[in-house]
Curated annotation (Swiss-Prot):
This is Inner tegument protein. InterPro entries: Herpes_U30, HSV_ITP. The keyword Transcription regulation does not apply. One of its GO terms (cellular component) is host cell nucleus. Residues 490-952 are annotated as: Interaction with large tegument protein. Belongs to the herpesviridae inner tegument protein family.
Length: 952
């Protein structure tokens, strides 16, 4: 894979300005392994200047470039930055890239026909490559228009070009990523399902575009209407659950989705104090668990040990069915991944099983969040829940990396490098999960690993095509670079491919005088490009050259006696000297070329995860080749130590910056939470009274000259309480986001640590301890512990559940304004008193039993200032209703003239209780009076104000 660009203009100028053959060759070599911007190939004048700058009659590599310039310029041509815009409108990016490549091809066609002609013949000739590029463009345009299949591209040398790989990557992302798999989904009979299950699957299949087979589902809006009107027991007020609202965001979200469907408005949103969806016995008994990942709110409740009113037997049975379904899903995924039907078919089948279970990329992200927020921590009341947790973790991780690989997949070397790195990250994260869930077989829900089951994503190198292309390269030197480039792009093993292919036909050797060979070797200077072919062909010359030049130069390089840039110059000379006189130095030259580019990658900070371990392997190969001539040869570790620090110190710095940023943020959060917790506790435990006439709360403020009264309107106080509690929630969200970033960084640390550990037994020794990655890992673990401890502390503060302390203020009123208006406008002769009963909202749930009351304290003036700093609404002032509001004009008695209203007291399931029950009853009576006064105090031109609680 190419890591950086070179300007064709700059290369051309350098070739024109230098005089030595070695310098010109060096520029060509540099261009050989770097990217060229496609926009430069659209500049006909620039391309012609480059071709005219190539030296004449130099033979070998430059001669091949001169006669095969279309191949040479296009093979490393890149379409970026257009290609890098792949996050924007996708079809537009594909069109831009195709247009750019088409312009470059047209420009080169013009050059070949008008100026340079199409010299030569064969697979890599200018004429054939231009023809193949035209065919490739036609194929890509047809795929983009959906008029041909992705897999219909015929084998062509063009598919190995960087520009073609970039277009293929875009096309595969566009066509594979959002496509519904063409597999049988085996949908159940929806008619036997309950309304909730039908609505869930109807919304899912219509949103994702999943076929439902022969069975038809009712419209999601109709089903939502049925849920809202006939299944009120599905919904529960957030103040009626035993955990704070933040621990049930998905139950809240599910209720919101139902109401959006009900209103047929995807933008609608229920209020903060709106209902949640709860678990029901009948649902858990009948839900089809093969759609497990559609029920995030159920997993959320079970993770928090919350079963609502469901029996333990029902929950246990539901969990057991979920375990069976997810185990089957794991088996199906393994079958989909191992079937030898080609990567596209593997992807189709694998994605089909994920979608059938409801495991879309979005749902995968939601379940990862749920696992992060999981509160059970292994302490659960349901025996099989830990097993379910492990299954969900493994399958969610698998789906996460499946979608990550799907975004990267194409049959290209670009995809191979990215997917290999992604699967290394998957292995690291899976290992972290295994360690977190304990040792032993139990911690592994499946026999397969994520890197193993997703290995079908790794594109295989087109070795047959590469071999044919290699056979069409006449220059041995160019052929060597071709295979080295293939090795770097496709991560080929040098011992299996390069060792066989980098063996050009040797020139016939000639007998030589040994003294002449030694004398000639002594006369050779670093930088010489000319050589005496008759001596270079001698059998003994290579051995003598290694002793007198190669080994001493390599000793100086590895001992760091030379500046690194000077060392690279000498290494480059070793590679290029007499390169077109095989078999001279062929055994040493192969690993030297690989070593050169690997060192260049490291010192240029073009970081690739495998760079350092590859560099060690190439160093070993170089040393082995040198030891054939100098058996006692050894290399100093100085260069390796330097490259180790260069390669990994930047990574360590990034890891340190991440953890330091986390510590700084967490420290700031802890300081702010301390103030927030104190203010929340102050309000929670303060004494106050309720002024029913003014609709205000009155707090006695302790002062030097006795108590003062701080009066605040109920809406302002509710806003204060809600804001303080929301601040707590925001802190938890901030901590979770920081923890997510820290976790991602920790996975990077795991991958790097694993790579370094794998090098400890390498035959090339160096100082592993110069960078303390183990200490860094310990620091990360301490940070995770700190985050968990702080989040737990925040969740246990009064401020975190402050609205529960003042729950009655946030509840809907027991009697609505419409009912009050009906009472005021009641006609003895026309109206039936029984109509009032339908307007009375009976409490729907059970308030948790009163907790033990703590000590109450009076607020101080400083407390008021502290509260106001965090919640500006905490300001003194009475309600907007006038104090002398118009009183009721009707006369009421305790009896009715005709029909009495008989309230069934047993239907009142809930009663909000305070410490003083008499005060509570007195307050409720006064509240009703206030509602009447407010109604009568408004004129018809000014509609009566409504408490938000009445409209929710």
């Amino acid at each position: 894979m190419m890591e950086n660009k070179r300007s064709l203009l700059k290369i051309t100028q350098n070739i024109q300005n230098v005089t030595s053959k070695l310098a010109k060759l060096r520029e060509i070599l540099d261009l050989e392994m770097k990217m060229i911007d496609a926009t430069e190939l659209c500049n006909q004048q620039l391309v012609v200047k480059f071709l005219n700058s190539l030296p004449q009659e130099q033979g070998g590599l430059i001669e091949f470039v001169t006669t095969h310039y279309v191949y040479f310029l296009f093979k490393n041509c890149t379409l970026s930055p257009q290609f890098l815009e792949r996050g924007t409108e996708h079809e537009e990016v594909v069109s831009k890239c195709l247009h750019l490549l088409k312009s470059a091809v047209e420009c080169m066609s013009q050059i070949t026909s008008d100026l340079f002609g199409c010299q030569g013949s064969g697979l890599l000739s200018n004429r054939n490559i231009l023809s193949e590029l035209q065919l490739f463009l036609t194929w890509a345009q047809n795929v983009n228009r959906n008029s041909t299949e992705l897999t219909s591209l015929p084998t062509t040398p063009v598919q190995t070009f960087l520009c073609a790989e970039e277009i293929m990557s875009l096309l595969y992302l566009s066509k594979l990523y959002n496509t519904i798999p063409s597999v049988q989904f085996n949908m159940p009979n929806f008619q036997t399902m309950g309304v909730l299950e039908q609505w869930t699957i109807s919304l899912y299949t219509s949103t994702v575009g999943l076929p439902t087979g022969p069975y038809q589902l009712p419209n999601a809006t109709e089903l939502a209407c049925a849920l809202v009107s006939r299944h009120a027991d599905l919904f529960i007020s957030p103040t009626h659950v035993s955990q704070p609202l933040l621990t049930f965001p998905f139950a809240k979200k599910r209720a919101n989705l139902i109401f959006q469907s009900y209103l047929n408005n995807p933008q609608a949103s229920i209020t903060e104090t709106g209902p949640l969806v709860q678990l029901r016995e009948a649902d858990l008994q009948t839900l089809d668990t093969t759609f497990f990942f559609l029920y995030d709110y159920i997993f959320e409740a079970l993770s928090n040990n919350q079963a609502y009113s469901c029996s333990a037997a029902t929950v246990n049975n539901f969990i057991a069915r979920c375990v069976d379904s997810l185990t089957d899903l794991g088996s199906n995924l393994l079958e989909a991944s191992t079937a030898s039907r080609g990567p596209s078919n593997n992807i189709d089948a694998f994605k089909g099983f994920l979608l059938r279970a409801g495991l879309t990329e979005k749902n995968c992200s939601d379940f990862k969040t749920l696992l992060l927020l999981n509160k059970s921590n292994g302490h659960t009341q349901w025996k099989q829940f830990p097993k379910l947790l492990r299954l969900v973790t493994q399958l969610t991780l698998t789906a996460h990396y499946f979608y990550a690989c799907l975004q990267q997949y194409s049959p290209t070397s670009l995809a191979r490098c990215k997917i290999t790195d992604t699967l290394k990250m998957a292995a690291a994260e899976q290992m972290v999960e295994y360690q977190a869930s304990g040792s032993g077989k139990q911690s592994k829900p499946f026999e397969w690993t994520i890197p193993g089951i997703l290995s079908f994503f790794i594109p295989q190198p087109p070795t047959e095509l590469l071999q044919v292309m290699s056979d069409n390269i006449s220059s041995p030197y160019m052929q060597s670079f071709f295979w080295i480039s293939a090795h770097r792009a496709w991560q080929l093993k040098p011992h299996t491919i390069l060792q066989r292919e980098l063996s050009p036909t040797p020139l016939p050797s000639s007998p030589c005088n040994e003294e002449d060979v030694k004398k000639y070797c002594r006369e050779i200077q670093v930088g010489d490009t000319a050589y005496q072919l008759n001596i270079v062909k001698c059998d003994t010359f290579e051995l003598e050259f290694i002793k007198t030049h190669a080994f001493p130069i390599l000793q100086n390089i590895f001992s760091m006696d030379l500046h690194i840039h000077r060392a690279m110059v000498q290494l480059r000379w070793l590679i290029t000297f007499a390169a077109d006189a095989p078999p001279f130095l062929s055994t040493l030259r192969k690993p030297l070329i690989l070593l050169y580019f690997q060192i260049n990658d490291i010192i240029s900070q073009n970081r690739v995860d495998t760079s350092f371990i590859n560099m060690l392997d190439y160093t070993k190969d170089v040393l082995t080749a040198v030891q054939e001539a100098v058996p006692s040869a050894e290399f100093s570790p100085n260069l390796i130590n330097y490259l180790f620090l260069t390669h990994f110190s930047s990574s360590l710095k990034i890891l340190m910056d991440t953890v330091n940023e986390f510590v700084t943020e967490t420290t700031t959060v802890a300081e702010s939470v301390a103030s927030l917790a104190r203010v929340g506790a102050t309000i929670c435990h303060s004494v106050f009274s309720f002024n029913t006439r003014n609709d205000t709360l009155e707090f006695p403020i302790a002062g030097e000259n006795g108590d003062e009264i701080f009066q605040i309107s109920v809406p302002a106080f509710k806003s204060t309480v809600a804001n303080l509690q929301q601040n707590c929630y925001d802190v938890i969200v901030l901590l979770n986001e920081s923890s997510r970033e820290l976790h991602a960084s920790y996975l990077d640390l795991q991958v790097i640590s694993s790579d370094i550990d794998s090098m400890r037994n390498h035959s090339i020794k160096f100082d592993h301890a110069s960078l303390n990655f183990k200490g860094m890992k310990d620091f990360y673990i301490k940070c995770f512990a700190l985050q968990n401890k702080l989040a737990s502390k925040i969740a246990n503060t009064c401020c975190y559940s402050l609205t529960r302390r003042f729950a009655p203020l946030f509840e809907p009123e027991l009697i609505s304004l419409q009912t009050v208006e009906n009472i005021l406008n009641f006609s003895d002769t026309v109206d039936d008193p029984s109509v009032f009963l339908s307007g009375i909202n009976q409490p729907m749930g059970c308030v948790p039993p009163n907790c033990q009351q703590g000590a109450v304290e009076k607020l101080s003036k400083q407390d008021v200032l502290d509260i106001r700093e965090l919640a500006p609404d905490f300001t003194e002032g009475a309600s907007s209703a006038p104090a002398n509001a118009t009183v009721i004009k009707h006369n009421f008695t305790g009896t009715f003239d005709k029909v009495s209203i008989d309230l069934d007291q047993s239907s009142l399931n809930t009663e909000f209780t305070f410490a003083d029950k008499e005060y509570n009853l007195r307050t409720l009576r006064q509240l009703k009076l206030i509602f009447l006064e407010d109604l009568l105090s408004n004129t018809p031109q000014s509609p009566p104000p409504t408490d938000p609680a009445l409209t929710n």
